[in-house]
Amino acid sequence: MLVLITYDVQTSSMGGTKRLRKVAKACQNYGQRVQNSVFECIVDSTQLTSLKLELTSLIDEEKDSLRIYRLGNNYKTKVEHIGAKPSIDLEDPLIF
């Protein structure tokens, strides 16, 4: 299923900057950054549970915000991209 992860981490303190880097790194382990603080991730339910647990352990719920949108398996008709940074098909093979 495709999930969209968005987050807002307060970075006015040193701890916030560190949390921001850790949240971004955790999201990169599961998906592709599509904008600042926005990731598209193709995950199954077990991976989503693991990702949620990891992210909630990293953020400060008093200062930070995390949103997870489940777009499901039939997401291709629900996502439209306009403008710079062409879309990447997350299900295509990656060639390095």
From Swiss-Prot:
CRISPR (clustered regularly interspaced short palindromic repeat), is an adaptive immune system that provides protection against mobile genetic elements (viruses, transposable elements and conjugative plasmids). CRISPR clusters contain sequences complementary to antecedent mobile elements and target invading nucleic acids. CRISPR clusters are transcribed and processed into CRISPR RNA (crRNA). Involved in the integration of spacer DNA into the CRISPR cassette. Functions as a dsDNA-specific endonuclease, acting on circular and linear DNA; has no activity on ssRNA or ssDNA. Mg(2+) binds at D8. This is CRISPR-associated endonuclease Cas2. Its EC number is 3.1.-.-. It comes from Halalkalibacterium halodurans (strain ATCC BAA-125 / DSM 18197 / FERM 7344 / JCM 9153 / C-125) (Bacillus halodurans). Its cofactor is Mg(2+); Mn(2+); Fe(2+); Ni(2+). NCBIfam families: cas2. Homodimer, forms a heterotetramer with a Cas1 homodimer. Pfam families: CRISPR_Cas2. Binds 1 Mg(2+) per homodimer, shared between the Asp-8 pair; divalent cations support activity in decreasing order, Mg(2+) >> Mn(2+) > Fe(2+) > Ni(2+) > Ca(2+). GO terms for biological process: defense response to virus; maintenance of CRISPR repeat elements. Optimum pH is 7-10. Belongs to the CRISPR-associated endoribonuclease Cas2 protein family. InterPro entries: CRISPR_associated_Cas2, Virulence_VapD/CRISPR_Cas2. GO terms for molecular function: DNA endonuclease activity; magnesium ion binding; protein homodimerization activity; RNA endonuclease activity. Keywords: Antiviral defense, Endonuclease, Hydrolase, Magnesium, Metal-binding, Nuclease. Inhibited by EDTA and Zn(2+). Activated by high concentrations of monovalent cation with a preference for K(+) over Na(+).
